[in-house]
Amino acid sequence: MKRPKLKKGSKRLSCHKRYKIQKKVREHNRKARKEAKKSGTRKQKKEISVPNNAPFKAEILQEAQRRRQQEEELKQNRKLERQKEVAKRRKLDEKKKKNSEKREKRDNKKNKGTKAAESAEVVSCRHVNKVLEQSDVVLEVLDARDPLGSRCAQAEEAVLKSPNKRLLLLLNKADLVPRDVLEKWLQVLTAELPTVPFRCLPQAPSKSPGKKHKVPNTADLCTENRCPGGQVLLRILHSLCPSQSDAIKVGVIGFANVGKSSVINSLKQSHVCNVGPTKGTTRVLQEVRLDPQIRMLDSPALVVSPQNAPLAVMLRSVSDCNVDVLAAVSAILKHCSKQELMLHYTLPDYRNSLECVTLLAQRRGLLKKGGVPDTEAAGRLLFNDWMGVRMKYYCQPPDSPGVQPHITKEVTAAMSSGICSEQLAQDNASTLKALKCPSPANLVVFTSVGPTGAIMDERQLVEPEPIEEELEANDGEEDVEEEHEGSEEEEDEEVEQEVVSAKEQEVVSAKEQEVVSAKEQDSKSAGPSVSFDQAQEDDAYDFNTDFV
């Protein structure tokens, strides 16, 4: 309270009020310290300053700086070690996760068993064997452009093992070969087995192959004018029936893209089998009833053996996914006439297959960015033309027919029994007259690579449980990789340690040089020299004697 006639009031307080204020101040400071501790803001430590009149001030400051740098390096090294440990743990967790996933996959594969190992080739081989077992007469469909290359000795041997089965050859696509060449092929093949030339009706891909779609505007599709060879084949099949009441099953076999399903559609006069421009359309066995006495069995394509020539594998295999286009084109060009191919594509003279494909790309405008010829696209174009109908080619029959080891005179007589050879020759001659054969000038002569081998036993396609061996090998590889990674990490750590030690040595040497230079300067300025090492050795330091 301000006293009268005085400018300032008294600072005297009651003890109760003073103690109360002090208590509030203490509480406030305590809360402030607590908040500062939570927020992480701490009081900066007061730097230890060295007085100017202290001896060896430069050395002391350098020593303090060196210790600070060492502490900082230790912090960085600890941080790197922690990061490495975290990365190692993360890698271990990822490896454990991958191993658990692989174990699950391994268990699933074991549970599935052999069903998971089955492929499309195994299924095709199985259905072909079913057709051979159920058939009374086997009809092997050959491509008239290359009859020798589309013939399979393994399938013929499988048919001839059973004495009650008959084997016939059907020379399909007979309208794509010159007439004189076709006559020579008929003479060669008929000397071994009964052979019938055939031309299928134009086939349209059926959207629903299960239904029978009648072809419009065709009263009699299987006449000699529309389907040459159809009546001859039906007559032979009817003659092989044991009686009018008994029906026979005729199995149709052959390699891919020879026209097995098209033959059945032409004989049935409707689209009962699925057909398409791609190979391997038929995947399973299909039974079609032509009449009360004949039942046709459509089969998948024969599985090509990988031991054949590369060109035979490319031309006869079902899948074209793994085909090297440029290698296939190179093999095709080696087996066909160069001049005829140049005339067909209007190309100049070329030296090798790569130059041919390059010229074809320039001719057709197949260019990449910058006008570079697209050889891959040109090779695919030539390969597709050869596999399709755009490239018209044929093979010359051999001068001396080769003797097939499984075809003997007894086999030929047994297969021809019940079939009049003279009548068959007359029917084939009339079929050739009904065909519209092309001129040899418009075709390319192709050299056949010989008969194509097939795989008839599905056990040759299924490997005996390779899953466990592969997984064990993979585990071994992973262990080797882990050891390799561990050794690499150890080497990296050793290199890092060497680098760090080298850096430390450099820093220490630099500091020693600085200390020496500082000593020289101090000695010059101070006059009498004082040994710092001696001072370190003497623990008792006397300021009265050593410091002036």
UniProtKB/Swiss-Prot annotation:
This is Guanine nucleotide-binding protein-like 3. It comes from Xenopus tropicalis. In contrast to other GTP-binding proteins, this family is characterized by a circular permutation of the GTPase motifs described by a G4-G1-G3 pattern. Residues 524-534 have a biased composition (Polar residues). Residues 465-497 have a biased composition (Acidic residues). Its main location: nucleus. Keywords: Coiled coil, GTP-binding, Nucleotide-binding, Nucleus. Residues 1-45 have a biased composition (Basic residues). Residues 64-107, 501-523 have a biased composition (Basic and acidic residues). Disulfide bonds: none annotated. GTP binds at residues 172-175, 256-263, 298-301.
